[in-house]
């Protein structure tokens, strides 16, 4: 195995692989064409800072390894599982395909799940609760799995995440288990925009987190917004940190102290004046 290949396998995780894959398989067909392979490998190597002068040589080596060790269909289609098995560790491979079975749309949905299982706000869920969590997750997606499959999923998750064997999983563990789309807030650059652009962006942001369409953020909607805000500056956050920041946000923005953040209250917090 060449150095570039070893480097990517050592550092590539399921989320990163999926982000790159989606650029080429926008329709989620589960395969890319052989003609797209060079560009896919280019993106993969660029992610890990492989020098341009070495790019062509490494891409060629990777293609040769793929052709030798994996099946390519007569139509020139390369399945995602072929490339994933080539670049991801066993654990990350498992996570990738589990996530495809149980996708989530946004951080609000994620936080609804987290709050249900971290009912005491300890910042952890017990490994014993993991089995119930996984069963509910499949039911949420209208998928029924056998007890044997559930036991296998639970056992693998514990092996991957409960490394210190304390029987607990934290917020970051759950975030890795679940397939969250890229942080919604990353697409906005509030500081670099005109007032009108900021207002327009604010409308999109509020609409995204106001899942219940009540005109106010409450419960997991506030949690989801807080989680995405924090992850802009701190990629790895704990449940305890999230609760602290949530409390600070409510203290500053919840003017009428009803436990919710009205649209006008959030706008005021962000220094915006919007039409009522």
From Swiss-Prot:
Taxonomic classification: Eukaryota, Metazoa, Chordata, Craniata, Vertebrata
PROSITE patterns found in the cross-reference section: EF_HAND_1, EF_HAND_2
Protein name in UniProt: Secretagogin
PANTHER family reported in the protein's UniProt record: CALBINDIN, SECRETAGOGIN
A single GO cellular-component term on record: dendrite
Keyword Calcium included in the entry's annotation: yes
CDD domains: EFh_HEF_SCGN
Amino-acid positions noted as binding Ca(2+) 3 in the UniProt annotation, renumbered to this chain: 210, 212, 214, 221
Database matches in SUPFAM superfamilies: EF-hand
Membrane topology: Peripheral membrane protein
Tissue: Highly expressed in pancreas, in particular in pancreatic islets and pancreatic beta-cells. Detected in prostate, adrenal gland, small intestine, stomach and thyroid (at protein level).
Naturally occurring in which organism (per UniProt): Rattus norvegicus
UniProt cross-references to InterPro entries, sorted A to Z: Calbindin_Ca-bind (IPR051001), EF-hand-dom_pair (IPR011992), EF_Hand_1_Ca_BS (IPR018247), EF_hand_dom (IPR002048), EFh_SCGN (IPR035798)
GO molecular function: calcium ion binding
Residues engaged in binding Ca(2+) 4: 254, 256, 258, 260, 265
């Amino acid at each position: 195995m060449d150095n570039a290949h070893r480097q990517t396998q050592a550092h590539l995780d399921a989320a990163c692989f999926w982000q790159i894959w989606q650029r080429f398989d926008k329709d989620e067909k589960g395969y890319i064409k052989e003609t797209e392979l060079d560009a896919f490998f280019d993106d993969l190597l660029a992610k890990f800072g492989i020098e341009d002068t070495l790019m062509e040589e490494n891409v060629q080596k990777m293609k040769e390894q793929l052709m030798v060790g994996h099946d390519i269909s007569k139509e020139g289609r390369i399945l995602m599982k072929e490339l994933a098995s080539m670049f991801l560790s066993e654990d990350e491979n498992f996570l990738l395909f589990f996530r495809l079975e149980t996708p989530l749309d946004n951080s609000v949905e994620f936080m609804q799940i987290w709050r249900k299982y971290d009912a005491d706000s300890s910042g952890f869920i017990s490994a014993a609760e993991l089995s119930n969590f996984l069963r509910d997750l499949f039911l949420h997606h209208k998928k029924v799995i056998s007890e044997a499959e559930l036991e296998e999923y639970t056992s693998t998750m514990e092996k991957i995440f409960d490394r210190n064997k304390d029987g607990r999983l934290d917020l970051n563990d759950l975030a890795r288990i679940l397939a969250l789309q890229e942080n919604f807030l990353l697409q906005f650059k509030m500081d670099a925009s005109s007032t009108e652009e900021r207002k327009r962006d604010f409308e999109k942001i509020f609409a995204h987190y106001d899942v219940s369409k009540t005109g106010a953020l409450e419960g997991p909607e506030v949690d989801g917004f807080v989680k995405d805000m924090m992850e802009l500056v701190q990629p790895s956050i704990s449940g305890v940190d999230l609760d602290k920041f949530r409390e600070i946000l409510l203290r500053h923005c919840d003017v009428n102290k009803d436990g919710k953040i009205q649209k006008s209250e959030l706008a005021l917090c962000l220094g915006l004046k919007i039409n009522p």
